A protein has these predicted regions:
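Metal-ion/cofactor- or nucleotide/acyl-coenzyme-handling active-site neighborhoods
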Residues: 1-219
Length: 219
């Protein structure tokens, strides 16, 4: 685990949703098949990056995670800004640091911590090598925007996680299975089984992750 200089503010989330269930909405192709299921209304709802393309989901979110391509895709930037300004009830968190450096210095196009704060978001730090079960002391593994919220909500005490639109790729809305991403999913499974053996993970309409967790078909 890699110590973080920037994640101490995440301490407020320790066991914040202890014993509750959550849905993570990613934007792989199967997001288009999603429909609410029994018990979904009571779940904590987390949306990722381009989930704004699905307003019926966005308007019910409790958390929104974003960061990449903020300065390289103006339409994307404007839609992030809109979520942060028009949905004050959504707690937004931004991937704004990586391995001890601000994304202003890194220059890859991710949002800077200063801009994240202007939008009312919580900037946090990722790394490229290890997951953590103490997100306020150590940086979370990045590589994909799906991994930080997984580490965050386990830290929050969530005991059941539904994965929607987590199809094993980096490209929103189209099939784009990535072996790199699947490698980190495998690492996540090992991390989760070691540090959080009790919480249950359920893949809704799984594709690349079929058989990795509990599978469920919801249409």
């Amino acid at each position: 685990m890699i110590e973080s200089k920037f994640n101490s503010q995440l301490k407020q989330f320790k066991d914040f949703h202890k014993g509750q269930s959550a849905i993570i909405f990613a934007t792989g192709p199967t997001i288009k098949q999603y429909s609410p299921f029994e018990g979904s209304e009571e779940c904590i709802k987390i949306g990722l990056n381009r989930i704004y393309d699905y307003p019926q989901i966005t308007e019910d979110l409790d958390y929104y995670y974003y960061g990449s391509h903020y300065y390289t895709d103006n339409a994307h930037k404007q839609k992030i800004d809109k979520i942060c300004s028009e949905y004050p009830n959504i707690t937004s968190l931004a991937s704004a640091f990586e391995e001890g450096r601000s994304h202003e210095v890194i220059g890859r196009g991710n949002i800077t911590p200063e801009r994240a704060l202007e939008l009312g978001s919580i900037p946090f730090e990722n790394n490229l090598s290890s997951f953590t079960n103490d997100i306020s002391t150590y940086s979370t593994l990045g590589h994909s925007i799906v991994f930080p919220p997984l580490q965050h909500i386990l830290y929050m005490g969530i005991n059941k996680i539904y994965l929607v639109g987590c199809d094993g790729g980096f490209t929103s809305g189209v099939d784009s299975e990535s072996q790199e991403l699947l490698f980190w999913w495998k690492e996540f499974v090992e991390f989760k089984n070691k540090h959080y053996p009790k919480p249950q993970i359920i893949s809704i309409n799984p594709v690349s992750l079929k058989g990795w967790f509990h599978d469920a078909v919801v249409k």
